[in-house]
Amino acid sequence: MSNNRKSSINPSSHWFDSNELFDNLFPDSNSSLMKRHWTPLEVAKKAAEFLAAEKNVRILDIGSGVGKFCLAAANYMPLAFYTGIEQRGNLVEQAIQAKEKVGLKNVKFLHGNFSSVNFKDYDHFYFFNSFYENFSFSENMDNQFEYSKELYEQYTYLMKTKLASKPSGTRLATFHSTEDEIPEDYLVVGTEMKNTLKFWVKI
């Protein structure tokens, strides 16, 4: 991997010393939601090192929640640019507020459904199975939306189609994925965290 690592110390980087410290950025958030739905810092670091192995790449987090992956990745691997897309407006607001607190410039957050995003605008992708709440209703984060297995199938098919349109060499990091959304021409090139974190490259 290249040397796309911190060349200077971010004065607010103490937030990334532990998951507990980071979660204090969101004092009103439910701690159980943090543990179940947000990317652990150690996972974010490993995924960022894989996705941002080259400088100036654009990385999209699909279903970014409060922005934990994007913020952590932007801190650990600052020579890439990170975008999070999230359909819950309240979480996007929290992500933007957290970004301001930690003082990172190489990250932004969008409010919307990933279906509206042009994957051509991004080089590599991170996915912590944000569709699964449509597959297992016990995993619902809240009652803001309707959930169904039909939506799960629709989203996984759409993501597979979008990923399939990307060129050879495209990288994807998945965490706790069912792999239904992975095109056949993406191959696993590495795993971490007892195989829950997988690294893929399109051949």
What are these regions (language model features)?
Residues 95:
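Conserved SAM-binding loop
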Residues 116-120:
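Short conserved loop adjoining the S-adenosyl-L-methionine
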Residues 134-203:
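C-terminal substrate-binding/active-site "lid" region of AdoMet-derived donor-dependent transferases
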Residues 56-65:
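Conserved class I S-adenosyl-L-methionine
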Residues 1-54:
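S-adenosyl-L-methionine
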Residues 68-79:
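Conserved SAM-binding loop of SAM-dependent methyltransferases across substrates and taxa
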Residues 103-112:
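Conserved SAM-binding strand-loop segment of SAM-dependent methyltransferases
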Residues 81-86:
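Conserved SAM-binding motif I beta-strand of class I
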